[in-house]
């Protein structure tokens, strides 16, 4: 009698931290370079989008049980928050910031992320739960879009376009992460599927109905107050200035 190989392996394997980061760096870097070549963004915006896309590539692991990965992820989030706050203070409020304030503000933002936001996430999340879902990525993307929109001049079409791009890069990085996790759940050499298959790339964590409902309501609200889309679609549809090779 011929025995069939087991469908599920006893030990789960998933993409590690470096794989997630490096893949997100490559793909989002190429994407931002493409937008730069087409004239949709300038170099400063391209670098910022690349940074956000790389963070998006780590975003689902914000519920990680690994303290080292969690430290790195939250440090990157804190850095992003610090840069956004300083950008808002110096460009939108148009005030001079003293040396002491330049030290105190980042420390306050970092402390808020580390001692308030992080414990909340650790308390309400489990690994490969709500954070490993399309609903969570969409929520984060729309939230990033809204924050960027509010921190910039809302009267210009360029601001709306850039706001949508920031959210898009967060979403792109997150999708890369989830796809990698699912790819690592399939053993192509033995044609077997690991037990972790299907736990990463899912619409929502329906086991946690309260968080899922809250996420849906938040997404609906963010869509309602989102920046205009028509100008963004029109701008990003023009690829006449794109140069692949000069």
Residue ranges and their predicted role:
Residues 2-246:
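N-terminal membrane-targeting hydrophobic helices
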């Amino acid at each position: 009698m011929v025995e069939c190989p087991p469908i599920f392996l006893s030990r789960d394997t998933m993409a590690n931290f470096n794989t997630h980061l490096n893949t997100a760096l490559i793909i989002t870097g190429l994407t931002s370079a493409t937008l730069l070549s087409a004239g949709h963004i300038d170099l400063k915006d391209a670098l910022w989008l690349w940074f956000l896309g790389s963070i998006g590539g780590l975003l689902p692991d914000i519920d990680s049980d690994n303290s080292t990965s969690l430290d790195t992820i939250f440090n990157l989030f804190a850095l992003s928050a610090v840069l956004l706050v300083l950008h808002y203070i110096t460009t939108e409020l148009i005030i001079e910031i003293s040396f002491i304030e330049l030290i105190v503000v980042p420390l306050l933002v970092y402390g808020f992320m580390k001692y308030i936001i992080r414990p909340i996430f650790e308390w309400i999340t489990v690994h490969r739960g709500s954070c490993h879902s399309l609903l969570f990525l969409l929520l984060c993307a729309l939230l990033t879009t809204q924050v960027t929109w509010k921190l910039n001049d809302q009267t210009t079409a360029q601001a709306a376009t850039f706001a949508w791009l920031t959210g898009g890069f967060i979403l792109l990085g997150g999708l890369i992460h989830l796809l990698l996790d699912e790819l690592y759940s399939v053993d192509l050499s033995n044609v077997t599927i690991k037990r972790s298959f299907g736990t990463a790339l899912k619409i929502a964590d329906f086991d946690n109905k309260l968080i899922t409902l809250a996420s849906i309501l938040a997404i609906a609200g963010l869509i309602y107050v989102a920046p205009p889309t028509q100008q963004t679609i029109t701008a990003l549809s023009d690829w006449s200035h794109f140069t692949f090779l000069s």
